């Protein structure tokens, strides 16, 4: 068999073998020596007649494999997929099944197609299954789908109301929008809010990069092939040479993409040794371009407005606002998102117990009701002559009470189950977001995710304690005593449990001080009352003239997770079983909250060191706060000393106590040295558990600073230990 020729791809130009009048690229299969192995890029948009698929197993992975009737097998072609997919996928030909080809003087004149066959997937040449559908039981995919078309899209755009829609749905909304002289009015299909957008064919909305990354990751893990048609992930070309070769590195200092030859030619000089180089990434470069100023890059984050800023945005629209760098903003928002997830995890266990308890209680109603009915019937047979009317009343009361109680429990179980399922999807979405290393993509949605989780916590209600009481307890009948004094001791019967109506009670506001502080500032301050034990004067720097031990710390104080002042304060309200006529504001029986504390004071639980910033002679360490009460933190740090032969020892450098923040900055460290940190929390009951050790290596002074992000991994280990 001859070697296959790759048509219209980087390895071969199609002009060498195809007529220039060829209007359909699928025709070029006839000009290849092996039609089953020909690949070329897809020239059509999504959902057109011609179907292509990206082949990762080909010689040129940037090419696309065409499933076409010009191949040796006109019915279907096997498409190679990624290693994460277990099955091969087949596509029925759609572009050339019913093709009419016209030649004129030996040259191709025209091609007409009339195929409308749908895309199918299967596992063999003869077996063809239905189109792959989105799993209905996935909570995460509900947050990845476009809310308007309910489809997975790689690119979605954020409306000012923070809801994301795909580009097709936005174009559809724009087509039917009300148009004025300078703008058109878009109505969000989720919240029905109106937004005035500039009248332009260009998309004026910011792209939701985090949503796109998570959707692409979900497609890769679950075997969806649509992510392979993403045209935004093409090769990055060199910005210096005229040959437009593929870029090898990106110079952060020059802000240029360079191929290998240009990199050696222009950056081999001694004056450019300080330039910083990174791998080329189309996603990173697109994300950091300001949507309002395309020539400027995003460099800072505004705390006041929760916006990403370039240099022009900062001085034009956010002058005087509290702005921080992107890496510091990622630290803040990651801590806030972790706090919101931890809040929900802290009460999820109790919610599950409540749901299980009511399911068991609901199933036991029938058996308990039959037993009670028999007891009542036998008792009233002895007293029928004088208690016939009373018997009727008691039976009606029990039946009505049982029906009313079941309705209340069914209503609580249904509403709470739906809310928990919704929150599970949101939590899964947030965990996937914490895996993201892109700063802009993460910061676009971090604050939104925190607000959504906290709103979900406020609207999840705890059941009314009256629902836990069995209905038979309201009819305490003792027929021996009733026989002797029936007229005096006959009970009046239980009071009817009042319905709460269809409206949900208004919850109390969430106490955000129960977990990690929302805001972490990065200005350094010194503490004069801390106990610091150091190995030598070269380890820590002290600037005070009275020579008191001081270390640069973060300025933001942490709000302690103190016990609420009222027993009704917490994170969740009760599900009410009050009367229909009773207003929500006047009912005090259901304004009770789930609590993080179980009533008994404990020593602090383990904490997690979630980020470190390392400089040649300084280091910043950030850690989380346990759910228990905390008075202060204590840190120990060691220097790792290696002596021959292969003998590694850790020498204590310092012990810092009475730390009132959740971060610490150390100065005058030795460059190119490995240090080990560990932190624990302390309260009135004593010190808690030490955190897992965190190893850092200070740079030698010539390289760039290092930032260690292990947030998601540390969060998962901490949650497994705590819950």
From Swiss-Prot:
Q: Tell me which InterPro entries the record gives.
A: COS_domain, E3_ubiq-ligase_TRIM/RNF, FN3_dom, FN3_sf, Ig-like_fold, TRIM42_RING-HC, Znf_B-box, Znf_RING
A GO MF label: zinc ion binding
Q: Where are the zinc fingers (B box-type)?
A: 235-280, 285-326
Gene name, please? Answer: TRIM42
Q: Which domain of life is it from?
A: Eukaryota
* UniProt lineage: Eukaryota, Metazoa, Chordata, Craniata, Vertebrata
Q: What PANTHER family does this protein's entry cite?
A: B-BOX DOMAIN CONTAINING, TRIPARTITE MOTIF-CONTAINING PROTEIN 42
Q: Where does Zn(2+) bind?
A: 290, 293, 313, 318
Q: Which residues form a coiled coil?
A: 382-407
Q: Per the record's keyword annotation, is Repeat included, yes or no?
A: yes
Zinc fingers (RING-type): give the ranges.
146-192
Q: Which family does it belong to?
A: Belongs to the TRIM/RBCC family.
| Limits of the COS domain | 434-492
Know the name of this protein?
A: Tripartite motif-containing protein 42
Write out the GO biological process terms. Answer: protein ubiquitination
Stored PROSITE patterns: COS, FN3, ZF_BBOX, ZF_RING_1, ZF_RING_2
Domain Fibronectin type-III as annotated: residue spans: 603-701
Keyword annotations from UniProtKB, A to Z: Coiled coil, Metal-binding, Repeat, Zinc, Zinc-finger
């Amino acid at each position: 068999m001859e070697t296959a020729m790759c048509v219209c791809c980087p390895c071969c130009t199609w002009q060498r073998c195809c007529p220039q009048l060829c209007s359909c690229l699928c025709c070029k299969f006839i000009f290849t020596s092996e039609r089953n192995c020909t690949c070329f890029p897809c020239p059509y948009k999504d959902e057109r007649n011609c179907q292509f698929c990206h082949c990762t197993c080909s010689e040129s992975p940037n090419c696309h494999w065409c499933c076409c009737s010009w191949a040796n097998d006109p019915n279907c072609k096997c498409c190679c997929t990624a290693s994460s997919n277990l099955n091969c996928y087949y596509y029925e030909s759609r572009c050339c099944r019913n093709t009419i080809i016209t030649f004129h003087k030996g040259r191709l004149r025209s091609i007409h197609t009339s195929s409308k066959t749908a895309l199918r997937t299967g596992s063999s040449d003869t077996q063809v299954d239905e189109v792959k559908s989105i799993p209905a039981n996935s909570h995460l995919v509900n947050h990845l789908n476009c809310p308007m078309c309910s489809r997975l899209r790689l690119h979605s755009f954020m409306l000012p109301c923070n809801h994301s829609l795909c580009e097709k749905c936005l174009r559809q909304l724009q087509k039917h929008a009300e148009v004025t002289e300078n703008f058109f009015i878009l109505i969000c299909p989720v919240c029905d809010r109106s937004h005035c957008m500039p009248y332009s064919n260009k998309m004026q909305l910011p792209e939701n990069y985090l949503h796109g990354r998570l959707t692409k990751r979900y497609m890769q893990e679950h075997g969806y092939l649509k992510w392979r048609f993403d045209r935004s992930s093409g090769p990055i070309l060199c910005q210096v040479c005229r040959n437009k070769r593929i870029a090898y590195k990106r110079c952060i200092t020059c802000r240029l993409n360079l191929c290998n030859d240009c990199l050696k030619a222009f950056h081999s000089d001694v004056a450019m040794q300080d330039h910083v180089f990174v791998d080329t990434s189309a996603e990173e470069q697109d994300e950091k371009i300001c949507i309002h100023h395309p020539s400027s890059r995003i460099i800072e984050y505004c705390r006041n407005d929760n916006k990403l800023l370039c240099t022009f945005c900062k001085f034009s629209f956010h002058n005087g606002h509290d702005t921080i760098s992107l890496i510091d903003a990622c630290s803040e928002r990651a801590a806030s998102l972790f706090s919101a997830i931890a809040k929900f995890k802290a009460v999820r266990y109790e919610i599950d117990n409540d749901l299980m308890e009511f399911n068991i209680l609901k199933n036991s109603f029938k058996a308990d009701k039959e037993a009670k009915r028999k007891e009542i019937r036998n008792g009233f047979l002895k007293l029928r002559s004088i208690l016939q009317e009373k018997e009727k009343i008691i039976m009606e009361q029990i039946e009505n009470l049982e029906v009313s109680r079941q309705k209340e429990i069914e209503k609580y179980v249904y509403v709470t189950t739906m809310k928990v399922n919704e929150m599970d999807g949101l939590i899964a979405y947030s965990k996937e977001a914490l895996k993201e290393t892109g700063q802009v993509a993460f910061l676009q949605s971090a604050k939104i995710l925190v607000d959504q989780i906290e709103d979900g916590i406020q609207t999840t209600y705890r059941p009314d304690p009256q629902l836990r009481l069995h209905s038979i307890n309201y009819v305490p009948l003792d027929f021996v005593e009733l026989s002797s004094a029936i007229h005096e001791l006959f009970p009046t019967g239980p009071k009817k449990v009042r319905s709460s109506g269809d409206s949900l009670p208004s919850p109390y506001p969430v106490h955000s001080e129960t977990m990690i502080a929302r805001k972490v500032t990065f200005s350094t301050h010194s503490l004069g009352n801390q106990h610091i034990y150091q190995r030598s004067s070269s380890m820590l720097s002290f600037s005070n003239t009275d020579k008191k031990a001081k270390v640069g710390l973060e300025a933001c104080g942490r709000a302690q997770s103190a016990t609420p002042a009222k027993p009704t304060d917490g994170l969740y309200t009760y599900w009410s079983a009050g009367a229909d006529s009773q207003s929500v504001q006047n009912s005090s029986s259901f304004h009770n909250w789930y609590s993080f504390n179980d009533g008994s004071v404990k020593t602090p639980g383990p904490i997690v060191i979630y980020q470190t910033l390392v400089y040649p002679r300084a280091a910043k360490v950030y850690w989380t706060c346990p759910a228990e009460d905390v008075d202060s933190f204590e840190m120990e740090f060691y220097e790792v000393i290696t002596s021959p032969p292969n003998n590694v020892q850790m020498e204590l450098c310092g012990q810092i106590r009475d730390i009132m923040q959740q971060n610490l900055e150390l100065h005058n460290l030795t460059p190119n040295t490995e240090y080990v940190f560990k932190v624990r929390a302390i309260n009135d009951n004593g010190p808690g558990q030490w955190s897992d050790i965190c190893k850092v290596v200070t740079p030698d002074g010539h390289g760039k600073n290092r930032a260690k992000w292990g947030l998601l991994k540390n969060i998962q280990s901490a949650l497994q230990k705590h819950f």
